[in-house]
Regions:
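A solvent-exposed, acidic/Ser-Thr-rich amphipathic alpha-helical stretch
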Residues: 45-95
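Hydrophobic/aromatic beta-strand elements that line small-molecule binding cavities or substrate pockets
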Residues: 74, 86-91, 105-106, 118-124, ...
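Short beta-strand edge/turn micro-motifs at domain boundaries
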Residues: 120-144
Length: 152
């Protein structure tokens, strides 16, 4: 722990290196891959923000605020699609930001359709916790997979 001064008051805080922040993100991904959603949520404060693009027909897309809302996001992901591939491949960190570049592939349970995309995930990490997340991905591919019927 380190003590820093903020607005004339001393505050204890944990100074995290960029490599420490990458390790937090990698731990979160490992929890997700193992289905350990509680372990993933334990890496977030109560006031976490979680942002995916709005995608027509995708019930769990959009912005969420708070750990319970993020839990609902992961319940929605599990209820609506099957993970076929989830591969974060590169991690770049600067300050409190960690960017993960990777690729994933999903099957939509209601339509049977698959979609895949490269992604960029931008995490904000503070004191060893993920305080923010934003995803950049191929939204058109996901929308098509959710809108097609299995017979189409």
């Amino acid at each position: 722990m380190s003590v820093i001064e903020i607005n004339g008051q001393e505050k204890e805080c944990q100074i995290m290196s960029e490599q420490d922040n990458i390790a937090v993100v990698q731990k979160a991904y490992n929890n997700f891959k193992e289905g350990n959603i509680q372990g993933l949520l334990d890496l977030m404060p109560d006031n976490v923000t979680w942002q995916l693009p709005e995608i027509q027909g995708v019930p769990f897309a959009g912005k969420r605020a708070g750990r319970e809302s993020v839990r609902e996001f992961f319940v929605g992901v599990e209820a609506n699609q099957e993970t076929l591939e989830f591969a974060p491949r590169e991690f770049v960190a600067q300050g409190d930001k960690v960017v993960s570049l990777g690729h994933y592939r999903w099957r939509v349970k209601s339509t049977g359709q698959e979609y895949s995309s490269d992604f960029a995930h931008v995490f904000t990490v503070s004191d060893g916790k993920i305080t923010g997340f934003q995803e950049y991905t191929d939204t058109a591919s996901a929308a098509r997979a959710y809108q097609r019927s299995a017979a189409a």
